[in-house]
A protein has these predicted regions:
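Class I S-adenosyl-L-methionine-dependent methyltransferase catalytic core
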Residues: 2-197
């Protein structure tokens, strides 16, 4: 698979051009090799990083599954989920993100953690990317789609037809339930887990 961490066509040299900026946010790696490292995130309201407490609970469930795993992070944003997985022992991670500021922060985080050789960054629409995957292509897949819109429902429907990972987990509003094998609620946020048959 082509590595795209340094694709000049999709790289932002100056995020100010996009009417926003990338800064060192309050998102941090929770455990593992990079524990405590802060991650750059886009400044503004276009992305919504997963809260630390939600990620901590999320990974306590997937702790064994991520070790040595091929990981997919859809709607990756700053890459917090995939980078957490790599910190906890995942073998590789593919990140899929379409927004330029989020991509800029993601690329900066991968570079800072020196993870270029274990990551592939795809500038693509997450749903279109997922449609091209093969069954079982990944061990673990994460998704954190925008709360507004139909992306979560469409992605889950796609996974039911084509289970591209052994374990698929998706963040969504707690008041918008998603049918799955297991759902955990954390205040207004929920994470639903779906396992390939």
């Amino acid at each position: 698979m082509e590595r795209r961490t340094r694709n000049p066509q999709s790289e932002i040299r100056n995020p100010q051009w996009e009417g926003g900026r990338v800064g060192l946010g309050f998102v941090r790696v929770i455990a593992g090799e990079f524990r405590g490292r802060r991650l750059k995130t886009p400044v503004g309201d276009r992305t919504r990083p997963t809260a630390d407490r939600v990620r901590e609970a999320w990974f306590s469930i997937l702790q064994r599954a991520v070790r040595g795993a091929r990981v997919l992070d859809l709607f990756a944003g700053s890459g917090a989920l995939g980078l957490e997985a790599l910190s906890r022992g995942a073998a590789t991670a593919d990140f899929v993100e379409v927004h330029r500021l989020a991509l800029a922060s993601l690329k900066a985080n991968v570079k800072t953690l020196k993870l270029e050789d274990r990551t592939t960054i795809h500038r693509a629409d997450a749903l279109e990317f997922a449609e091209r995957l093969h069954p079982g292509q990944y061990d673990v897949a994460f998704a954190d789609p925008p709360y507004a819109g139909e992306q979560a429902a469409r992605l889950v429907a796609l996974f039911r037809v084509n289970p591209f990972a052994r374990t698929f987990s998706i963040e969504h509003p707690a008041d918008q339930p998603i049918p799955g094998d297991d759902t955990r609620r954390y205040g207004d946020t929920a994470v639903t887990f779906i396992y390939a048959p």
